Amino acid sequence: MTVFDIPIAELNGRADLLSRHRGRTLLIVNVASRCALAGQYAGLETLAHRHREDGLSVIAVPCNQFGEQEPGTAEEIADFCSARQISFPFTEKTDVNGADRHPLYTALTPFADAEGHTGDVRWNFEKFLVSPAGTCVGRFGPTVDPQDPELLRAVRAQVQ
């Protein structure tokens, strides 16, 4: 089983978002519109746009588990994205930690970041890089900017 086999719906309710990206490199990011790190949306959009034709898909996962910074409904989250011209897909609102952790995050969180951290997602905007084969190949902390050279090198290694 790969990440592409894990069912998760889009924000609009359309099923099986990940399977529709099978064979592409994914950057999966838990997001929150009211987080101080929400400025990263612009960098994620730039990254998605720059590497879309190379096979990269940025997938945003709205989550309200960190400081209740994503309290909005699906419609409110969609309006937020539209107002900021965010074009990459969003999943349904999802738990990334705890008893109701989505199976996607059960698959992703064992992977260690550069500091050796595994397990629970620490905050909004933690990033997981998934290879075209559907395995996690990178994990980047919440404060790692989408334009960080290390993150960009890891993305380029997967899309080329």
Q: What is each stretch, according to the model?
A:
Residues 24-25, 34, 38-62, 82-85:
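Conserved helix-turn-beta segment immediately C-terminal to the redox Cys motif
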